[in-house]
Each structure stands twice: as C-alpha cells, then as structure tokens.
C-alpha cells in the first residue's frame, strides 16, 4: 500500500506529457524526412506539374505566416510539422536559436548523402522547398531576416535550380540505366544488325557475280569458293542458305550440281544455262558422289587432269545454248539435277533432246517411265518454268534487236544529214 501511494505522486510529477513536450519528437521527424528524401531519389524524375506544385506549396508556406507566428500546414512533408511550444513566441531565445538550425541541417544532409543515381540532382529542390517551409514556420517575423532560406539570395538561387530541373525533366526519355553494359549491348546489337545488312548485301552481290560468271566450270567455281572460305569472316552466311532460292549457283555444294538435291529451286533460265556449261570433259570424277549410269560415265572420266584455267577459258569462249539447243546428254544432266537420274537411261534411249523435252506432256512422261505422280508434277513444273524463261529470253532478244536497228537507223540518218 505504501509503495502504491508513493507511485501516485511520482506518476503525477513525472508525467510524460508534461515533462517531455512534443519538441522531443523533432529528432524522429528529421529522420523521417531524411528517409523520405532518400526514397524520393529512387523515384521517377519529377514532372513540371510536380515541380510547380512543390514551388507553390513552398510559397504558400511563406505567405501563411501570421503576426502571431501561426502557420497553416500547406503540404504533408514531416518537416512542416516541426512546430512546438518552445519557439511559438516571437521573442523567445529558443525560437531565435532554432531559426539557424535548418540551414545547417540542410547542408549536413546534402553533404552526408552520396548521390546513388543521376536522379538525385532533383533532391536539392525538394530539400529547399521543405526547409523553406520549415524556416518560415519556425522563425518569427522579426527573426526571419538572418535565415538563409528566406534571404533574397536563396530566392534568387531557387528559381535558377527550378529551370534547370525543368530543362532536365523536359527529357521524354526513360531514366538512364545505372549500368553501362545495357547501353553497350544496344550499341553492339545495332552494330550486329548493320553487319547483317552488309552481309546480306555482300551475299546478293556475290550471287549477281555468280550469275554473271555462270559460264565458268565447276573447277574454277571450286577455286573461287576455296579462296572465299579461307579469307572470309566467320560471320558470313553460307551461300546455299541465301542463294538457293534466288537461283544462283551454290558455292558451298561444290560437288556436281547435276546430282545435288539443293538445285531443285533453280530458275529455269539458270538451270538451262548451267547444264549447257557442263561439258563432257569439264567435271572430274572425284567431284561427284553419285556415279550416273549411261553414256555419261565414260565421257566424264575422259579428261581427269583438266586444268582450271583451260576449262574456264574454254567455257568463256563458248556461247551458252538455250533449251531448244539441248542435246540428249544435257537432258540427262538436267534429270540428274532434279534427282531423277533413274529415268535418264530411258530418256537417253529415246534420244530426247531440248525441243522434244519442251513438248512432253503427262502421257508422254508416263511412256518414258515416270509412273510416280510426284515426279511427273515436278518435271511438268520445271518444263513450264523453262518454257516461260525461254519465251522471256526470246522477247528480250527481239527487243534488243529492235533497239539496235533503231540505233543503226539513227546513225544512218545522222550521217546523211
């Protein structure tokens, strides 16, 4: 009982609400403000509207000072809630001494905080706005002149920081990456894209060159391919992936094009001209993995040591015969290029040449041994393409002949005049 009686006056004397006023919470509020400023540094860049709102809230906090030192709470920052009865009076020394604390506190906060990211350049603006309201709230009107927050120099410095942040916020780009490897990856990706474009251009130019030099023999094409493989970049694509659909010669498949299945996608003009270049004495027997049956086996083995220069010069001198001038041997080579070498013997026995080949229909193909409907459809499609290409070539030759005739007439008229 005695102890309880003693505790009652002790509790009355040392009541926390009376002995420790609200000013004891100033430290926790400052820590909260510092934590909020650190959290603001990790957020997105402030927009113009947010900057205007912060500036207007700071001006409202300055203009709301009454003669009695009462301040209306303009914004929700914890620094604006730092009022206490200690500095409510205009003449109290505690109020005057507390008036000089916020600038030093702001400087210490700015000096202690290392900038974690480029976004922290907006932090002084929020600091200035918050501490400006704090200075206006804590200082009395006579004592507010020495404060650096309410001085004209700070007011002049504050609008300078605001246009800078507005200029920076004018950027519509996303926040800068913290790691330089992201930008490096974008640059390298762009370089690789440009490299792919140049490689595609190089491959198309290479296919054009191969189309122009389709009269070269397989030996010369093999030498060109070997030199390109030795000095080329490892990023170069294989030519049979890019050129097979365009109908150009496959430099990767240097084996005999008459036996390669990759040549099924050739254009008719290309296939017609390519078979015409493959003469009997050009291809060595080692270059063909499949040994065809028929009269071509002896012809291919007749000159196994034919040099590259002789074969290339020889084919450069000879003109390319069109499909109408194909022989039965060239028809057999064309069948081998379509992987239909099993029918080559029947075609050779019946002496089917180029003009007869273009006149073949379904019944004639059946009589030649093409019992498979898929093989007949393939041959019909290729024959149709070759006929269209031959017609196109004939029209182009006629047009060129007409143009030459016109030029000759103009020259004659110019000489007469």
Swiss-Prot record:
Point to the regions of Low complexity compositional bias. 135-153, 244-260, 276-295
Can you name one GO molecular function term for this protein?
Answer: actin filament binding
Stretch forming the signal peptide: none
GO CC terms in record:
actin cytoskeleton; cytoplasm; dendrite; postsynaptic density
Tell me yes or no: is Coiled coil among this UniProt entry's keywords: yes
As stated in the Swiss-Prot or TrEMBL entry, residues carrying the post-translational modification Phosphothreonine are: 283
Query: Which keywords are on file for this protein?
Result: Coiled coil, Phosphoprotein
Residue ranges of every copy of the SAM domain listed in the record: 326-389
Can you name this protein?
Sterile alpha motif domain-containing protein 14
Q: Where does this protein come from, organism-wise?
A: Homo sapiens (Human)
């Amino acid at each position: 009982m005695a102890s309880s009686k003693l505790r009652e006056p002790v509790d009355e004397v040392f009541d926390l609400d009376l002995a420790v006023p609200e000013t004891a919470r100033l430290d926790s509020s400052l820590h909260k403000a510092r934590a909020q400023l650190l959290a603001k540094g990790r957020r997105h860049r402030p927009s113009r509207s947010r900057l205007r709102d912060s500036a207007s809230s700071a001006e409202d906090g300055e203009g709301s000072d009454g003669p009695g030192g009462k301040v209306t709470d303009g914004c929700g920052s914890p620094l604006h809630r730092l009022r206490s009865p200690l500095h409510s009076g205009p003449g109290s020394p505690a109020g005057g001494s507390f008036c000089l604390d916020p600038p030093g506190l702001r400087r210490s906060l700015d000096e202690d905080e290392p900038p974690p990211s480029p976004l922290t350049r907006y932090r002084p603006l929020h600091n200035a706005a918050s501490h400006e309201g704090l200075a206006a709230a804590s200082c009395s009107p006579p004592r507010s002149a020495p404060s650096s927050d309410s001085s004209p120099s700070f007011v002049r410095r504050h609008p300078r920081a605001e246009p800078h942040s507005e200029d920076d916020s004018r950027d519509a780009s996303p926040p800068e990456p913290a790691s330089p490897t992201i930008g490096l990856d974008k640059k390298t990706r762009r370089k690789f894209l440009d490299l792919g474009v140049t490689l595609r251009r190089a491959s198309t130019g290479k296919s054009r060159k191969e189309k122009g030099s389709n009269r070269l023999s397989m030996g010369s094409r093999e030498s060109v391919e070997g030199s390109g493989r030795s000095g080329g970049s490892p990023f170069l694509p294989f030519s049979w992936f890019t050129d097979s659909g365009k109908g150009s010669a496959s430099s990767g498949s240097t084996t005999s094009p008459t036996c390669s299945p990759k040549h099924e996608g050739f254009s008719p003009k290309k296939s017609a001209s390519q078979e015409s270049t493959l003469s009997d004495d050009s291809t060595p027997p080692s270059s063909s993995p499949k040994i065809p049956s028929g009269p071509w086996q002896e012809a291919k083995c007749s000159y196994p040591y034919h040099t590259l220069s002789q074969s290339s010069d020889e084919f450069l001198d000879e003109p390319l015969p069109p499909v109408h001038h194909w022989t039965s041997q060239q028809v057999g080579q064309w069948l081998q290029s379509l992987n239909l070498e099993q029918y080559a013997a029947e075609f050779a026995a019946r002496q089917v040449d180029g003009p007869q080949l273009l006149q073949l229909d379904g019944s004639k193909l059946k009589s030649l041994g093409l019992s498979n409907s898929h093989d007949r459809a393939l041959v019909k499609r290729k024959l149709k393409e070759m006929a269209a290409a031959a017609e196109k070539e004939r029209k182009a030759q006629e047009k060129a002949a007409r143009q030459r005739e016109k030029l000759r007439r103009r020259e004659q008229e110019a000489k007469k005049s």
